[in-house]
């Protein structure tokens, strides 16, 4: 399914023209919804603390989660106490739920499980971000909120909007859903505070971000880990993220010998039997997002590659200066 969608959205498949009328309808509905909020006919809830939206205008992975983790660490160093809210993609949540370190990804969502495992940040997930934000403020010592995704969730007023773009895929064929990958038109990029480009090359006015490998870590928390992956031994690599090829390319650039690669759809659930068959006793490597879904049954020779987002000092300074102004005005 994912490979077919990639052909449609990123490789010029002619079927996109047949879907164009549906894209026009989708575009009208999203435009009308935004207009209703901008005119005040639909109300956006304002919070007593600054709200940062980390989102995108395309469907699929672009690097939002590493960006959220980067922001959490940046804000903490600046003396702030961030909290995070998320929809919890792909899971059914009754009301609002706190995400705890060790929670299963199939209960709270892949990205929330990964964010909390890495940062132990106060984080709530729920279908209604407003409810999650209000509960976060009432139950935790938080003075700034980061929304993981939610750029198009206009019910929540925001102070800063950060859009993450895949620097290699950019906007694909430039068409709205379902003919293309866009949730909103390219014009939306002109209305956000920063466009952050993950990989590739940022254009003028955009912010360059790179994902730098930091360490090999064992997937399992139950076994004593053996030796981490070596560049002298063949590996089996898997990835169930928005752009799996980026992970495989990273391994190649680092000089690892990848014997076999296996892609899964983004947000796939994994079974022990499928991954055991894939690995067949060999060393299996994966992304951090995949690892949070495999910990309960991982073998001691399964490893994930932790990566850290890197952005410029000038971006940090601009962002923190705006946050300081917002805090003073709240």
Curated annotation (Swiss-Prot):
**Catalytic activities:** a lipid A disaccharide + ATP = a lipid IVA + ADP + H(+)
Per the record, the pathway is:
Glycolipid biosynthesis; lipid IV(A) biosynthesis; lipid IV(A) from (3R)-3-hydroxytetradecanoyl-[acyl-carrier-protein] and UDP-N-acetyl-alpha-D-glucosamine: step 6/6
Q: Which SUPFAM superfamilies match?
A: P-loop containing nucleoside triphosphate hydrolases (SSF52540)
Which residues does the annotation say bind ATP? 58-65
Q: Which Enzyme Commission number(s) are on file for it? A: 2.7.1.130
Q: Please name the GO terms of the biological process aspect recorded for this protein, alphabetically.
A: lipid A biosynthetic process; lipopolysaccharide core region biosynthetic process
- Give GO MF terms, alphabetically: ATP binding; tetraacyldisaccharide 4'-kinase activity
Q: What is this protein called?
A: Tetraacyldisaccharide 4'-kinase
User: In the UniProt record, which is one GO cellular component term?
Assistant: plasma membrane
Q: Give the UniProt family note.
A: Belongs to the LpxK family.
Function, as annotated, reads:
Transfers the gamma-phosphate of ATP to the 4'-position of a tetraacyldisaccharide 1-phosphate intermediate (termed DS-1-P) to form tetraacyldisaccharide 1,4'-bis-phosphate (lipid IVA).
Judged by the first EC level, this protein's enzyme class is transferase
Keywords annotated in UniProt? ATP-binding, Kinase, Lipid A biosynthesis, Lipid biosynthesis, Lipid metabolism, Nucleotide-binding, Transferase
Which HAMAP family does the annotation name?
A: LpxK (MF_00409)
Q: What sections of the protein cross the membrane?
A: none
From which source organism is this entry? Shewanella halifaxensis (strain HAW-EB4)
